[in-house]
Curated annotation (Swiss-Prot):
GO terms for molecular function: alpha,alpha-trehalase activity. GO terms for biological process: cellular hyperosmotic response; trehalose catabolic process. The lineage of its organism: Bacteria, Pseudomonadati, Pseudomonadota, Gammaproteobacteria, Enterobacterales. It holds the Pfam family Trehalase. This is Periplasmic trehalase. Residues 554-570 have a biased composition (Low complexity). One of its GO terms (cellular component) is periplasmic space. It catalyses: alpha,alpha-trehalose + H2O = alpha-D-glucose + beta-D-glucose. Monomer. It comes from Salmonella typhimurium (strain LT2 / SGSC1412 / ATCC 700720). NCBIfam families: PRK13270.1, PRK13271.1.
Length: 570
């Protein structure tokens, strides 16, 4: 048998021609080092483009239980060479696809199972996890789908081996609570680097995440850092805040009423709102087979349309939820891109307010007034188009049918979280959340049981925090306490039984991890750790902090709201 390295050398030119014969591939050279992002960095290609038919065949063969495994695999040589070899060998007798993959790729290693020391309190366990979840990837392999970052960062845990955008804010809350302001600063710096390098913060630092972003929490991150560093943080990251805003608002200047462009839409009355969007309309590399199956289940819709809506739901962070579907029991009815989400628009209101504050800190009063005006216009659009007067709660706007949607979700609390809600409406939202979403173990994401992970009976740490702080902002302390106490009790019971914190919780009871979705329940877990620490300090006085959830429910919350409703929303 001819050794593989000799065969490659001899057949190099022929192999390249064969590789190019059946598939048009786009390649971009890029630095595998987190270098100066101001240079003209070409966008690196995701593995489904680099590997073409090989990627498709491996994923369809279901060689790995998790489709993310091969998406994260590192080619051992030029992908063009590997693809050429594959084309030459795949039809030969006895060809073994799994062996071919093992020879040509380095597969991601399973993370070492963390066994916490016995007898740790909840707080001690979380503090001990921060170094376990910290990664540094200043340099990566040339063909790795992982994107390098200049500073260290904290990953969520489990199958999530990279940093994720909106997860990170809630993780950073916990890091700050633990006194790790250096890690907070590093993570803000990483996101600023990504904005400079790619024009936006991608879903995660993988090539296959570059075509979309996630809920825009960068403004909150900078505001958090400013609590420690003062206005210097606002001034330092003003350019990146402006670039992120430009990404979300791209094309707004030329939109006519009723038109849409990528992430921005203009309604018939001239109101401007935003939606989630992915630049690609193909199956997600990390969920390749699942997306193809979803598209095939609804032959009445173009597959590309379904793929973009699946991807855009991933951009929302809520992948997946009945919130985006016409039929909650049929994922292929998803239509994320025809919905203007209430939470996204609340977050962009916050971005506009932060831009105004940062501009003022930098001494640019004209820009500060400009961003304040944009925030005021968005706040009016939220009140006009994202309030369901019949039901009495904030909801998403249906761009396809030009009307407000009826479904109550935990996203209804976001206008309260950013202080964009009218006071009387905030009270109605509090009552609705208490009546329809509050469960024994915390706040349910929706009241619909669809089998999707962003539906009942699951509750997610970030939504508990948004609800608790949003309710406090408007004096709804009793409901805020119920959300906080019930979720913390759930987390404590899970920790007592399993000695871990999980990605999501079943809130229909206490002490049960959540289910549903595309992958098994993950532990770690960054944002649950962060929210748990914040909530522990919410229920216990500063002079007597608690390291675990008290056995008796406190009479009231200890902390005061970090924000108060603006004059415009009284």
């Amino acid at each position: 048998m001819i050794p593989p390295e000799i065969r490659r050398s001899v057949l190099l030119q022929k192999a390249i021609k064969l590789a190019l014969a059946g598939t048009l591939l786009t390649f971009a050279s890029f630095s595998a080092t987190a270098a100066d992002p101001s240079s003209d960095t070409e966008t690196p290609q995701p593995p489904d483009i680099l590997l073409g038919p090989l990627f498709n065949d491996v994923q369809n063969a279901k060689l790995f239980p998790d489709q993310k495994t091969f998406a994260d695999a590192i080619p051992n040589s030029d992908p063009l060479m590997i693809l050429a070899d594959y084309r030459m060998q795949r039809n030969q007798s006895g060809f073994d696809l799994r062996h071919f993959v093992d020879v040509n790729f380095t597969l991601p290693k399973a993370g070492e199972k963390y066994v916490p020391p016995a007898g740790q309190s909840l707080r001690e366990h979380i503090d001990g996890l921060w170094p376990v979840l910290t990664r540094s990837t200043k340099n990566v392999e040339k063909w790795d789908s992982l994107l390098p970052l200049p500073e260290s960062y904290v990953v969520p845990g489990g199958r999530f081996r990279e940093i994720y955008y909106w997860d990170s804010y809630f993780t950073m809350l916990g890091l700050a609570e633990s006194g790790h302001w250096d890690k907070v600063a590093d993570m803000v710096a990483n996101f600023g680097y990504e904005i400079d390098a790619w024009g936006h913060i991608p879903n995660g630092n993988r090539t296959y995440y570059l075509s979309r972003s996630q809920p825009p929490f960068f403004a909150f991150m900078v505001e958090l850092l400013a609590q420690h560093e003062g206005d210097d943080a606002l001034k330092e990251y003003l350019p990146q805040l402006q670039k992120e805003y430009a990404y979300w608002m791209e094309g707004v200047e030329t939109l006519q009423p009723g038109q849409q462009n990528q992430r921005v839409v203009k309604l018939e009355d001239g109101s401007v709102l935003n939606r989630y969007w992915d630049d690609r309309d193909t199956p997600r590399p990390e969920s390749w087979v699942e997306d193809i199956a979803t598209a095939k289940s609804n032959p009445n819709r173009p597959a590309t349309e379904i793929y973009r809506d699946l991807r855009s739901a991933a951009a929302s962070g809520w992948d997946f939820s009945s919130r985006w579907m016409d039929n909650p029991q049929q994922l292929s009815t998803i239509r994320t891109t025809t919905i203007a989400p209430v939470d996204l628009n609340a977050l962009l209101y916050q971005l506009e307010k932060t831009l105004a504050r940062a501009s003022a800190a930098a001494g640019d009063r004209a820009k500060a007034s400009h961003y304040d005006a944009l925030a005021n216009a968005r706040q009016k659009a939220i009140e006009m188009h994202l309030w369901n007067n019949k039901e009495g709660w904030y909801a998403d706007y249906d761009l396809k049918n030009n009307k407000i949607r009826d479904q109550l979700t935990a996203a209804a609390l976001f206008p309260l979280y950013v202080n964009a809600a009218a006071k009387d409406r905030a009270a109605k939202v509090a009552a609705a959340a208490q009546a329809h979403l509050l469960q024994p173990g915390g706040l349910a994401t929706t009241s619909v049981k669809s089998g999707q992970q962003w539906d009942a009976p699951n509750g997610w740490a970030p939504l508990q925090w948004v609800a608790a702080e949003g309710l406090q902002n408007y004096g709804q302390d009793d409901v805020a306490m119920e959300v906080t106490w019930r979720f913390l009790t759930n987390v404590q019971h899970t920790y007592d039984r399993e000695k871990k914190l999980v990605e999501k919780n079943d809130v229909s009871s206490t002490g049960t991890g959540g289910g549903g979705g595309e992958y098994p329940l993950q532990d770690g877990f960054g944002w649950t750790n962060g929210v748990t620490l914040k909530m522990l300090d919410l229920i216990c006085p500063q002079e007597k902090p608690c390291d675990s959830v008290p056995s008796t429910r406190p009479a009231s919350l200890s902390a005061t709201p970090t924000k108060t409703p603006s004059a415009a929303t009284q």
